[in-house]
């Protein structure tokens, strides 16, 4: 893994200037609890934290997810804990004994049918974890909460109806007058950290994430790879299932490794404490350019934007289960079902709306100078999906 730590810039000087902090970190091992370890960013954190050149590292890592440990992360050096964090008793039994945890990275969520239910369910999950950890971890120093860019729009479910802030989106924008489970989570976090003197927090708000996780509900790169593989199997053109604004307008994304780097930075750098940060790659792209990249990777004809089309992958892919089963069998792929690897609702959400661009100025002003080339980032995660045998690796 190629790391692009903030250390290359101003933040290294800031941390080097604080010698007492560095000495303290060297004397005590950093111990991470990653909640949502099988998600896009959780997976990146689990790969990154145990490395010897990671700041504060090598970290000891506990990884928490609801399902049993998957085969694709078995080689990650961590203690894996299968735990449903919505179950208060299970959380208390399985997490409260982890008394050596120094940092919590919370990067999970659940979806319900209404935003009111989202607020209740996601708020309970976070509070369960914090109730189990804060009283039982004497050396707990920092909590990273990952939310997202929907902080700036009215609702994850119907944001076009309820409105949003004008762009570029900045961290100091006021909350909208609507239900949003990110607001609920932040309120719980800020209240819970008061229970322990010196406990700090940070909130991280990525937009569309490019990363790797077969279990993520928002796995855009993996979903598009599956779509392209099906087009190849059927000899079909890779049509663009989205709007003109997404095809020809400017978009951005956040590399999962970059988000993990920002969270580790915020967990260790005193200048990042008790702050909320946007996180994106720092450049812009157009989907019409990345679409050609995707087509080339799967050896299919690249479609153009079709004026007036209403192509949505949720509709197009609903009967493609047998096609996917055939692809898996013929290519000796990992045994997956289409509904597990294709998150069509999410690709439709992203590609049928113009991107709401954010600003990275606050993050840079506080010392985090990390960035990614989004085209290279897209290619990297496509290659990772292939490397884990989830889609065919070679096409001509």
From Swiss-Prot:
Keywords: NAD, NADP, Oxidoreductase. It catalyses: (S)-8-oxocitronellyl enol + NADP(+) = (6E)-8-oxogeranial + NADPH + H(+); (S)-8-oxocitronellyl enol + NAD(+) = (6E)-8-oxogeranial + NADH + H(+). Gene3D superfamilies: NAD(P)-binding Rossmann-like Domain. NADP(+) binds at residues 38-40, 66-67, 84-85, 108-109, 146, 182, 209, 216-218. Its EC number is 1.3.1.122. The active site is at 182. Pfam families: PRISE. Coiled coil: none annotated. GO terms for molecular function: oxidoreductase activity, acting on the CH-CH group of donors. Belongs to the short-chain dehydrogenases/reductases (SDR) family. Iridoid synthase that catalyzes the first step in generation of the iridoid ring scaffold using the linear monoterpene (6E)-8-oxogeranial as substrate. Iridoids comprise a large family of distinctive bicyclic monoterpenes that possess a wide range of pharmacological activities, including anticancer, anti-inflammatory, antifungal and antibacterial activities. Catalyzes the conversion of the linear monoterpene (6E)-8-oxogeranial to (S)-8-oxocitronellyl enol, a precursor of nepetalactones, which are metabolites that are both insect-repellent and have euphoric effect in cats. This is (S)-8-oxocitronellyl enol synthase ISY2. It comes from Nepeta racemosa (Catmint).
């Amino acid at each position: 893994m190629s790391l692009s730590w903030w250390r290359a810039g101003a933040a290294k000087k800031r941390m080097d200037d604080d010698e007492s902090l560095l000495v303290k970190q060297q004397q005590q091992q950093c111990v991470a609890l990653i909640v949502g370890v099988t998600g896009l960013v959780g997976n990146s954190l689990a790969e990154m934290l145990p490395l010897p050149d990671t700041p504060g590292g090598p970290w000891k890592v506990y990884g928490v997810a609801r399902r049993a440990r998957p085969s694709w992360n078995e080689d990650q050096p961590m203690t894996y804990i299968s735990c449903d964090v919505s179950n208060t008793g299970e959380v208390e039994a399985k997490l409260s004994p982890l008394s050596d945890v120094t940092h919590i990275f919370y990067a999970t969520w659940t979806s319900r049918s209404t935003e009111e239910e989202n607020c209740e369910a996601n708020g309970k999950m976070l509070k369960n974890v914090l109730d189990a950890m804060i009283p039982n971890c004497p050396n707990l120093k920092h909590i990273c909460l990952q939310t997202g860019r929907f902080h700036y729009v009215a609702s994850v479910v119907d944001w076009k109806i309820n409105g949003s802030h004008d762009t570029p989106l900045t961290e100091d924008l006021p909350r909208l007058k609507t239900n949003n489970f990110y607001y609920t989570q932040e309120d719980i976090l800020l209240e819970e950290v008061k229970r322990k003197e010196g406990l700090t927090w940070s909130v991280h708000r990525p937009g569309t994430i490019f990363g790797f996780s077969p279990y993520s509900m928002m796995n855009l790169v993996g979903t598009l790879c599956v779509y392209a593989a099906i087009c190849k199997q059927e000899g079909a053109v890779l049509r663009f299932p989205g709007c003109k604004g997404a095809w020809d307008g400017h978009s951005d994304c956040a590399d999962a490794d970059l988000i993990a780097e920002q969270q580790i930075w915020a967990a260790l750098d005193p200048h990042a404490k008790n702050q909320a940060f946007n996180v994106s790659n720092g450049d812009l792209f157009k989907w019409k350019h990345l679409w050609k990249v995707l087509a080339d990777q799967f050896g299919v004809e690249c479609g153009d934007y079709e004026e007036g089309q209403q192509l949505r992958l949720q509709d197009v892919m609903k009967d493609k289960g047998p096609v996917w089963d055939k692809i898996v069998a013929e290519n000796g792929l990992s045994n997956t079902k289409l509904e597990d690897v294709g998150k069509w609702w999410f690709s439709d959400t992203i590609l049928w709306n113009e991107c709401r661009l954010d600003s990275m100025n606050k993050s840079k002003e506080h010392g985090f100078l990390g960035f990614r080339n989004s085209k290279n980032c897209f290619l990297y995660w496509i290659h990772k999906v292939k490397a884990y045998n989830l889609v065919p690796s070679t096409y001509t």
